[in-house]
Amino acid sequence: MRPLLDEAKRRVDRRLSASRQSLSTSRIFPSALPERLKDDHDAQVDYTAPPGGGGTKEGHFQYMQQSIFGMIAAVGSQSDFHARFDDSSDSERDTDRPPQKRTEKESQATDAPPSSKNEKKALRSPQRPKSPSQERGRRHRKTLSGSRILRPLMPGSSQRQGGAQTEPSTGNQMSRVPSPERPRSTTPRAAPVLSRMVEAQALFDSKGSMNQSPRSPPAETQEEQSQEQTSASPLSLRLMEMFGFESPEKVLVEYACSLVQSMLLQGYMYVTEGHICFYAYLPRKSTVAIKSGYLYKRGRKNPKYNRYWFSLKGDVLSYYADPSNLYFPSGHIDLRYGISASLSEPKEKDREARDFQVTTDQRTYYFRADSSTSAKEWVKSLQKVIFRTHNDGDSVKISFPIESIIDIEESPMVDFAETFKIRAIESGETYAIDEYYFSFFNDGQDAFNFVKGLVSESQAKNPSRESPQPGRTTPQSRARGSRARWSLTSGLSQVLGSSDARRRRSASASQFSPGRDAAGLSPTSRQRDLSESFVNSFDQATESSTVLQSMTDTAESASQILNRSDVFQYPAMQPFRRQSLSEDQFGRRHSDETARSTNDIARLGPGITPRDVQRFYPPSDSDHDAQDAARVQQSASSLNELVRAGAYPLQRAAGLAEYLRNRSKQMGTLLASESMGYIEKVSGMWAGGRRHYGEAEGILPDDQDVDPEDKEDGCNHGDRFRAHFALPPTEKLQATYFAYLHRVLPLYGKIYVSQKKLCFRSLLPGTRTKMILPLKDVENVEKEKGFRFGYHGLVVIIRGHEELFFEFNAADVRDDCAVTIHQHLESVRFLSESGMLAEQEQDESEAAKAEHRMLQEARKDASGGLIPQTPSDESPEIHPIFDDPRASIINFKPTESLRITCLTIGSRGDVQPYIALCKGLLAEGHRPKIATHAEFEPWIRKHGIDFAPVEGDPAELMRICVENGMFTYSFLKEASMKFRGWIDDLLSSAWRSCQDSDLLIESPSAMAGIHIAEALRIPYFRAFTMPWTRTRAYPHAFAVPEHKMGGAYNYITYVMFDNVFWKAIAGQVNRWRQSELGLKATNLDKMQPNKVPFLYNYSPSVVVPPLDYPDWIRITGYWFLSEASDWTPPADLMAFIQRARDDGKKLVYIGFGSIVVSDPSALTRTVVESVQKADVRCILSKGWSDRLGDPASVKSEIPLPPEIFQIQAAPHDWLFSQIDAAAHHGGAGTTGASLRAGVPTIVKPFFGDQFFFGTRVEDLGVGICLKRLNVSLFSRALWEATHSERMIVKARNLGQQIRSEDGVATAIQAIYRDLEYAKTLARQRSIVSSTPFSPTPSAKTVAEQEVDDDVTDSEEWTFIGDETDIDISRRVRGRAVSDVDMLPEPLAVRSPELAQ
C-alpha cells in the first residue's frame, strides 16, 4: 500500500502522474484495498431490514424519522441506490487500463530528445522575425506526456532575465501560450478558400525576409547611452525602458490623473523634457458575468427581432433562448474582434434610442433594449469589454513628443474633476491629429498651466513646426524615434513597449496611427481599409461560417462539409497589385503554410493595409524600395476605389476568370482532393471513436485509427475547437469523443474535453446545438446503462442543473471519456483550491505587477518617499464615464419591531433551526415566537424566545408506523381512523397560536400557515430543510430514484407530490377555512404556493441553487445553533479520544438515531464487527435499542469491545470536531453538522429526505451513501472514509465553505428584501377569498380604499413567472373585481393592521 501524502502538491502529483492508476468512475480508492475488506458472504444482507417483512424487493424500507410527511409521501419515496461495491467494480477498473498504457507512452515520448520538427515555437519578438524553419516548425510540435496537467504547477517553469523571456525547455515545461488571436486557417471569419489562396500571394515575397535579424546599434552609441543612464534618476531610466526612449529624459513633474476614452483609465501622467507620458496599470480580465439581461436581436437575414437572454462574460457576448439553461447558448459574439458598440439613431427624433449595434470585423449585429437606459448601459459595458480585448494586457502606455503638440485647452466634462484636451500631430507620413483628454481630481489647474507653458516654449523654439515636411522612417527608426505612441501592452512585451510582441491587435504607433476611435484605428485609415475589405471579399460571413479544414478531419458537420467547396462560394475580386508571384511559389496548395501566412494578416485585426503588412513582414532585398512601394499602394488604392464604384457583377466574373486562367491546374487538384475529403469526413464522423491530443494539440501517436495526414495537421484541431465555441487561446484541447446527447431526442455530435471546459457540438444537418460546460460546475460523472439497447450511458452531474446524459456506441469509449473527465475534474479543483492561474496568465500578471511595482519604487525614490496617489490605486475595474461609482444600497430593514411567529411541527431536528433564526431576530430587535409541540417549550424558553403550543404529537404517528409498517393495509386502516382527528387538532391549535403576528414563517409540514396568513392578511414565508420548490435540478426529497432520471422526472415529482398531498388534506382544510377562518374554499391554483417566498436552511455549497429557481427562493445556509459552550464532555470520553490518538487509530462516530429495526442485536453486532474489521475506534450513539417496536423482540445486548465507546448524547458541533469520519442516517441537521466539521460522511438513509442528502453527499465526493448495511459494505466504507485522501480533502474544503457562511444573517436579509412582495401576495389572496365572516382590519374604509391598489399590486407581482401562473392570476384578479362589493365588515380586532 502506497503511503498517504498530506501535502496538496504531492497529492496532485500522485493523482496526475503518468504511472497513476486510472480513475474509477464511481469512487476512487487512494491505494489497494486490504484483503480483509473484500466482499464476504453477507454482502447482500441488510441488517436494517424493517419489522414485519414490509420491505421492498431490494430489502429497502423507509421509516418515519423526523418529518410528518412520511405518512403521506412515503409511498413515493421508495427508492434504491447502487451498491457502492458490487461485482462490476473489477470490470470497471479493467476498462480503465488503456488510458494508463497511453500515458506510459506519452511519458516515454516526453523523455526522448526532441527532433527538429518537434521543437516548440519560440515567442515572437518585434526585433527578431521568425525564420522559415521556425515557421514550419509550427505544424510539428512535441506531444505532451501524461502529466501535462501538472506542468503549470512545477516551479521554475519560466525564467525572466534582463526583462526578456527565456525559451522554455522542451521536456519539462509547457510551451508559451499565445495571446488571444485569430485561429490560423480555421477562423470562421476567414475568406473563402479560393479567395484566401489568391490573397496569400501578397505574403510569399515578404516571408523570405522573416529570418533577418535586427541591426544592433554601433558601439559608440551604446557607450553614450550607458554614460547617460549612469547619471539619470531611477524614474527616468524606468520610463526610458517602458516607453522606448533613445536616452533617459529628466522627469519634470508627475500627476495622478485619468485618461478619458469611452471609460476612465486611472493612472499617472509623467512630463519629461521631451515627452508627455501616461501609464495605467489594468487588472486581469474578469471571469464573471459583467452584465446579463433580456435583449432583442435582429436576425441575420430576417429583419424581425427575437428576444433572448444575453450574458456578457469575459470576451464573449452569448445569448440564450432559455435563461435557466445557460450551458446551451443559441449563439455568441466574439468581442476579441469587436470594433465598436454604439447607439443607433432613433427613427423619431423626439424618442430616445433603444436600439444599438455592435460592429465586428466581419459583421454588424443589431439589438434592441427594453428602455433607453438599458441600451446605454449595454453599450457602455460592451465598449469596456472591447477596450479590454484590444488591450489584452495589464497596462496602458501613451507617449507623444511635446514638440508634436498643437494646442491644449480646457474641456470641462464632469463636475467633480478638471479636464483638458491635448491635440497632437502624429510624426510620420499621415500627420493625423490626435486628441487626448485627461481628467484630474486634484491639481488639475496646475497641470494645465505647466503643460501649456511647455507647449508655448516648444512652439517658440520651433516656429516652422506647424508646416512639417513629409518624411519616411523605417519601422525601427520610428520605434526608437520621437513619435506619438498609444501602446496597450502586457508585461511580457516590456523592453521597448513595442508593437505586437505576439501579434496582438493593440499595437504601438510603429504600426498604427494613435488617433483611434473605439476600433482603435484612425478614421481615415479605417475608411481606406474597409473599402479595400469591401473589394476583397463578398463572402456571406456567419457566426459559425466555413473554415479551412484538414482533408480528413472528422469534426465537420454535414452542412459545413458542403460549405467547404469553393464552387458554392462567391469568388473574391483580387486587388490590383504591381507584382505577381511565381508559379512554383504558389504551387503548394495543400501546405498549411499558405493558409497560415494568409491568416497572419487577418490575425492583426481589421483594417490592416499593405503598408502595415510590410511593417509586420520586413521587405527582402529583392523587393521594391519604399518609395516605389508607396506609389504602388497609392495606385492600388485609387483603382480599388474605381472598382468599388464600378459594376458590381463584373467583380465576380473577373475574379473567377483570373483564377481559372492562372490556376487551372490547382483548381482541378483542389476539387478532386476535396471531393474525396467529403467522403472520408462523413464516414469518419459516423464511425465515432475517440482522440487524445498532446500539449501542442496534435493527436497522440498511440491513438488508434489515426490517419498519418491527420497527425501532421493535428495542430489545427485546437484552433477549430476554440473557433467553434469562442474560447481563448489558453483553452487547450485534450480529447474528443463522438456520442449522443439525450435531451428530448438523442442528438449525435462531438464531445470536446479541454483543460477547463466540457463542450458538445451537434453534427446533424439542420441542428445548431452547442454546449459549453465549465468543469468547475461538474460535480461528478457516473456510468449508467444506455437508454437504447446496445448503447452505453454516461451521466454528468452538474451543480444546480439537471443531469446530462450521453450515449456511446462502445463501452471502452464511454469509460475512457469518464476517466478523462475525472482526471480533469481533479486538476481543475486543485487549481481552484490552490489559487493557481494558468502559466501564461500568471506570468503576464506577475510581469505587469512587477513593472508597476518598479515604477512605484522609482517614483518614490524621485519624490523622496512622497508620491501622489490615484483615487483608487490598482482599481479593480475600468470606470464608465458619468456613471455613479457605486449604486446606493437600499436598507430593507423595517423601521418598527415586528411580531414574528415561526410555525413548525416534527422532531427536535425540525425545531432547532428556528431557535437559531429567532435568536438572530431577537438581536435585530424583533419579537419572535415559536409555535410547536409542548414538549419543546422548556428548550425554547431557555433561549429567551416566546412559545405557543401546537397540538398533534408526532410520536403518535411514529407509533402507527412502528406497529403496522409503512403503508401496509393495517397502517392505512388505522391512519384513516386516527389521522383525521390529528389534523383537525393541528389546524385549530395553529390558528390560535399565530394570533397577534405581523409576519408568519412556516415549515410546509405544518400545513396551516398559508391559510392563517391569508386570514390575518399578514406576510407569509416558508422555510424548510429539504427541497420543496419545483426544479429540474433535483428530485423531490421523498421521490429520489434509484438511478438518475433527468430533469423531466425531477420536475414531475414535485407536481405529483403537491397534488397528492393536497388531495389528502383538502377536505379538512377547506372545512376549517370556512368554519374558523371565515374564508372561501380554495385549491392549489388559487393558493399559488410556488409564488410564496421560500427560505431553505441548508448550505448553497451542499445543495447548489438551481438555475431555474425564481428570485424569491433563497438558499441561505445552515441555521446552526451552537450549544457546545454549555456542555462539558465526560472525562471517560475524553480519555477514549486521547487513547485513540495515542494509538494512531482513526476515530469515527456512528449513530443512526431512534430507528426501528427488526433485529437490534444483529445491527449492533454488524456495527461492532465492521469497526473491528476496519481497524478504527468508534464513538457509538445506539438509539435503535432504546425504542423497539415489538417488546417481544428484546434480546440480550451484545457487549461492546474496548474499540467502541457508547454515549447517550453530545452536541454535534463539539463531537464532530473530534473525529475523522461520521456515519449516520442522513437527516438534514445531522448531515449539515458533519459536513460543517469537514469530515467524510457515511449515510445509511432510512426515510424521506435522508435519501436526498445521502445522494448529495455522494455526488459531492465527500462521503458514501450505503444501499445496504452489512459487515462487508460498512467496514469497507469506514476504511475508505478514513483513508481516502481525495475524500478527506474534499470534505475539509466543503467544511471551510460551510463555516464561512452565516445562514441566519442571510435569511434575515432575505426576509427584509422580500417582505413587501409577501405583503402584496397576502393582500391579493385575502381580497379574493374573503367572506362576511373573515377577520379583517378594523376599518371598512381602509379595506375599500386599498382595493384598487391591491388589484394593481397583484398585476405587478404575478407577472413574474410562467404563463400558467399568469393565466391563473388573471382569473384571480377577475374574481377580485367582482367581489369588491362583498368585502366584509370586520369581525375581529385581534389581527394587526397592515403596514401602509
Curated annotation (Swiss-Prot):
Species annotation: Aspergillus terreus (strain NIH 2624 / FGSC A1156)
SUPFAM superfamilies named in the record: PH domain-like, UDP-Glycosyltransferase/glycogen phosphorylase
Record's comment describing the protein's domains: The GRAM and PH domains are required for the localization of ATG26 to the preautophagosomal structure (PAS) and are involved in autophagy.
GO biological process assignments: autophagy; carbohydrate metabolic process; lipid glycosylation; protein transport; sterol biosynthetic process
Entry annotated with the keyword Repeat: yes
Chain spans, region Disordered: 1-59, 82-193, 206-233, 459-531, 576-635, 841-880
Annotated compartments: Cytoplasm; Preautophagosomal structure membrane
Purpose of the protein: Sterol glycosyltransferase responsible for the glycosylation of ergosterol to form ergosterol-glucoside.
Short name of any one Pfam family annotated for the protein: EryCIII-like_C
Alphabetical list of PANTHER family matching this protein: STEROL 3-BETA-GLUCOSYLTRANSFERASE (PTHR48050:SF25)
Gene (name only): atg26
One GO CC term, this protein: phagophore assembly site membrane
Reactions catalysed: a sterol + UDP-alpha-D-glucose = a sterol 3-beta-D-glucoside + UDP + H(+); ergosterol + UDP-alpha-D-glucose = ergosteryl 3-beta-D-glucoside + UDP + H(+)
Topological type in the membrane: Peripheral membrane protein
Annotated UDP-alpha-D-glucose binding sites: 907-908, 910, 1210, 1212, 1225, 1229-1230, 1249-1250
Compositional bias per record (Polar residues), positions renumbered to this chain: 18-28, 156-175, 459-479, 487-497
Domain PH: 289-387
Boundaries of every GRAM domain copy: 237-288, 719-785
Superkingdom of this protein's organism: Eukaryota
Compositional bias segments (type: Basic and acidic residues): 1-16, 35-44, 82-108, 585-595, 846-862
Protein name: Sterol 3-beta-glucosyltransferase
Protein family membership: Belongs to the glycosyltransferase 28 family.
SMART domains: GRAM, PH
UniProt-listed Enzyme Commission number(s): 2.4.1.-, 2.4.1.173
Gene Ontology terms, MF aspect: sterol 3-beta-glucosyltransferase activity
